[in-house]
């Protein structure tokens, strides 16, 4: 529960735009899974199953509230250990982190979501494709778009790995 709660809450918040509602949705999903735990051995990939359940419940909640469904990642918690000892380097590190967060937030919504799921939540392309009902190729393309835009935004030329 605690391992996935933070990631699932951020994911649901991106859909419903309310942290409290997102926490309620995630809690409801976990309660539902607990109540139906005898079927857990039938689920092949539990983490993916939970993400899909959260997505479906969040969309259902929006429909109940007659709101337009948009997927957005506005609350990305980026944690960075301070690698620098002197205050000047710490300020520069903080400014760099802010620049990266701004660049991530300026990505197109789908590219931002794919980037978050792949890089922050460490999901595989196939899991992302299943979760978002898109092809693996679309996941690859969206991640490529995100990485190119981020590289341009932070001033690093984009180079493919050899």
Language-model region placement:
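C-terminal edge and immediately downstream basic/flexible tail or linker adjoining helix-turn-helix-like DNA-binding
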Residues: 130-131, 147-162
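Sigma70-family region 2
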Residues: 30-45, 64-65
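Amphipathic, Lys/Arg- and hydrophobic-enriched alpha-helical face
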Residues: 1-19, 36, 104
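Structural recognition of an alpha-helix C-terminal capping motif at a helix-to-coil junction
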Residues: 10, 24-31, 44-56
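Arg/Lys-rich amphipathic alpha helix in sigma70-family domain 2
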Residues: 38, 52-71
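Residues within the DNA-recognition helix of helix-turn-helix
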Residues: 4, 142-145
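Internal acidic/polar
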Residues: 68-92
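Helix-turn-helix DNA-binding module
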Residues: 105, 109, 113, 121-138
């Amino acid at each position: 529960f605690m391992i996935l709660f933070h990631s699932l809450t951020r994911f649901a918040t991106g859909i419903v735009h309310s942290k409290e509602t997102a926490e309620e949705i995630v809690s409801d999903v976990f309660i539902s899974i607990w109540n139906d735990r005898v079927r857990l051995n039938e689920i092949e990939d539990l983490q993916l199953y939970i993400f899909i359940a959260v997505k479906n419940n969040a969309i259902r909640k929006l429909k109940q509230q007659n709101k337009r469904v948009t997927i957005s990642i506005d609350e990305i918690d980026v944690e960075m250990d301070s690698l620098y000892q002197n205050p000047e380097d710490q300020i520069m590190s903080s400014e760099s982190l802010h620049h990266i967060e701004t660049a991530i937030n300026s990505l197109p919504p789908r590219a931002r979501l794919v980037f978050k799921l792949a890089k922050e939540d460490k999901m595989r392309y196939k899991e992302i494709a299943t979760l978002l009902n898109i092809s693996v190729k679309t996941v690859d393309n969206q991640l490529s778009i995100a990485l190119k835009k981020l590289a341009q935004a932070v001033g690093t030329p984009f180079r493919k790995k050899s």
